[in-house]
């Protein structure tokens, strides 16, 4: 080591014989010396001027112990020479206090808390706007409604106009008007006819559908005038009130939060075993092994959806049941929760050991397929458009957002039938599984449930139902896509319009 230093100094002296590191001054405010570090014109190092070094004698002893055995002995001596002997200035009293001051930084934690609070309010407010439409879509997917259209027969001849003697019929007309005033006026004839038509629905359901043992309660069911989302929302508002529009709002928020958290935890855990970067910190397109990263994203999504399956069941239960019945009944000596609105109480009733084996294969399959569909389009989209079309979201924002819109439209077209079948399967499971502690009684439903006999029954159309009903709720999805696409286009940054300032 010493020989190398001597050789380096000799070669440096041969190149610049006039240069002396100890006395050479180029006019800089600080000079770097290999043996001492950065030194100011007065001969003191930068390390000797730190507040943590000048704080107390305790810190001086720690610094001496740190640099005493170091090969940079001259640097240690310069630090000791520059230490102040006047004691502490009252700000930091030692090295331990310095570390705690960095950890308990009020400004830093305040900024983090403000960011979390801002994100919380943004997500929750977004859910408040979206939830009424999602509730209406789920009711359309699982409910069967009798919609009667009122038509006017144009071929029927109109009644002829009869001329009468006003003076002779005056007394009779006054009597008719008095009788007419006493009659009760029906201001809503259409709604009355729909309610009367739906009143016969339990009798028909009892004869045709043997899977549901009890008919629905007519006083709780909603009767929309059509299957349009707005009509369903109006009917729900008339039946359940304002809070009926935000059914399971907090449960949905908790489900979304847990879904993101668990999926992030799974990807972070499994990425270390697969030897690939976490997809949440590095996009799949930038991964050194794209296939492993893509499989990791799909697997984490599937595991997350399976773990949160009980919460998804509870969310469906809260939406399809009414607020008006709240009681606990005993069935076979066991307390069965019939219509509690508490997520904490309902999740306590779930047991994977008891209820996991009773989950039908259809529900497992539909849950996994729905998760794969979401992960496939979200994770594989950037990879496909970059490799096939050479489109990148930072340099080609308009084209990227347009391609993303078409990709989301295709995802919605595939997602709706899977979601429709999954909701029917969940409601059928909630109605008929006897081992389920929070089993739903059919008299608590606000809709008449559609018949569900399995996926193959729907595919083969054995029930002679309209297969177009599998895409119920597509209007809400399309409106959401269009609004999201419009926001992305308005928030885009036009690179050509920006000027770089120096």
Curated annotation (Swiss-Prot):
InterPro entries the record matches: Mt_carrier_dom_sf (IPR023395)
Query: Where are the annotated segments for Binds FZO1?
Result: 1-294
Q: Per the annotation, which location comes first and is thus the protein's main one? A: mitochondrion
Bilayer disposition of the protein: Single-pass type II membrane protein
The record lists the membrane-crossing segments as 294-314
The protein's location, in the record's own words, is: Mitochondrion outer membrane
Tell me where in this chain the PTM N-acetylmethionine is found: 1
The residues bearing each Solcar repeat, given as ranges, are 288-383
Q: Does the keyword Amino-acid biosynthesis apply?
A: no
Give start-end of the signal peptide: none
Q: What GO biological process terms are annotated to this protein in UniProt? A: mitochondrial fusion; mitochondrial inner membrane fusion; mitochondrial outer membrane fusion
Topology: which residues are Cytoplasmic?
A: 1-293
Ranges for region Binds MGM1: 312-502
Q: Which GO terms describe its cellular component?
A: mitochondrial outer membrane; mitochondrion
Q: Give residue ranges on the Mitochondrial intermembrane side.
A: 315-502
Identify the keywords attached in UniProt to this record, alphabetized: Acetylation, Membrane, Mitochondrion, Mitochondrion outer membrane, Repeat, Signal-anchor, Transmembrane, Transmembrane helix
Query: How is this protein organized at the quaternary level?
Result: Interacts with FZO1 through its cytoplasmic domain and with MGM1 through its mitochondrial intermembrane space domain.
Protein role: Required for mitochondrial fusion as well as normal mitochondrial morphology by bridging the essential interaction between FZO1 and MGM1. May coordinate fusion of inner and outer membranes during mitochondrial fusion.
Give the protein's recorded name.
Mitochondrial fusion and transport protein UGO1
Q: What is the source species?
A: Saccharomyces cerevisiae (strain ATCC 204508 / S288c)
């Amino acid at each position: 080591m010493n020989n190398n230093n001597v050789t380096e100094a000799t070669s440096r002296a041969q190149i610049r014989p006039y240069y002396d590191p100890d006395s050479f001054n180029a006019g800089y405010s600080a000079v770097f010396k290999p043996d001492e570090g950065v030194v100011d014109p007065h001969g003191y190092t930068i390390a000797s001027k730190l507040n943590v070094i000048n704080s107390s004698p305790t810190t001086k002893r720690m610094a001496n112990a740190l640099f005493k055995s170091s090969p940079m002995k001259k640097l240690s001596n310069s630090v000791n020479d520059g230490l102040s002997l006047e004691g502490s200035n009252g700000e930091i009293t030692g090295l331990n206090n310095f570390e705690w001051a960095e950890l308990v930084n009020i400004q830093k934690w305040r900024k983090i808390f403000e960011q979390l609070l801002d994100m919380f309010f943004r997500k929750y407010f977004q859910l408040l706007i979206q939830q009424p439409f999602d509730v209406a879509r789920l009711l359309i997917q699982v409910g069967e409604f009798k919609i009667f259209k009122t038509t006017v027969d144009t071929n029927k001849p109109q009644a002829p106009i009869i001329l009468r003697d006003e003076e002779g019929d005056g007394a009779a007309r006054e009597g008719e008007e008095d009788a007419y005033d006493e009659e009760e006026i029906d201001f809503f004839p259409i709604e009355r006819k729909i309610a009367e038509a739906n009143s016969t629905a339990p009798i028909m359901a009892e004869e045709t559908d043997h899977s549901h043992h009890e008919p629905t309660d007519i006083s709780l069911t909603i009767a929309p005038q059509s299957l349009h989302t707005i009509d369903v929302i109006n009917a729900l508002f008339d039946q359940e009130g304002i809070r009926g529009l935000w059914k399971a709002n907090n449960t949905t928020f908790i489900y979304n939060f847990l879904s993101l958290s668990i999926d992030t935890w799974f990807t972070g855990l499994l990425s270390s075993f697969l030897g690939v970067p976490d997809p949440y910190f590095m996009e799949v397109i930038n991964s050194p092994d794209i296939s492993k990263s893509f499989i990791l994203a799909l697997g984490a999504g599937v595991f997350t959806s399976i773990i949160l399956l009980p919460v998804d069941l509870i969310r469906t239960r809260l939406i399809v049941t009414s607020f008006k019945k709240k009681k606990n009944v005993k069935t076979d000596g066991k307390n069965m929760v019939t219509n509690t609105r508490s997520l904490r109480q309902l999740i306590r009733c779930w047991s994977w050991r008891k209820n996991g084996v009773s989950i039908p294969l259809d529900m497992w399959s539909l849950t996994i397929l729905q998760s794969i569909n979401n992960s496939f389009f979200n994770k594989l989209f950037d990879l496909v458009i970059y490799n096939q079309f050479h489109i990148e979201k930072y340099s080609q924002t308009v084209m990227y957002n347009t391609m993303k819109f078409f990709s989301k439209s295709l995802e919605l077209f595939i997602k709706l039938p899977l979601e429709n079948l999954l909701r029917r399967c969940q409601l059928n499971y909630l109605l008929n599984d006897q081992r389920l502690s929070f089993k739903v009684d059919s008299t608590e439903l606000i809709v008449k449930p559609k018949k569900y006999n399995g996926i193959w029954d729907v595919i083969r159309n054995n029930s002679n139902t309209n297969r177009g009903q599998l895409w119920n709720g597509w209007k809400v999805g399309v409106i959401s896509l269009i609004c999201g696409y419009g926001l992305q286009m308005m928030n885009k940054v036009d690179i050509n319009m920006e000027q770089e300032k120096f």
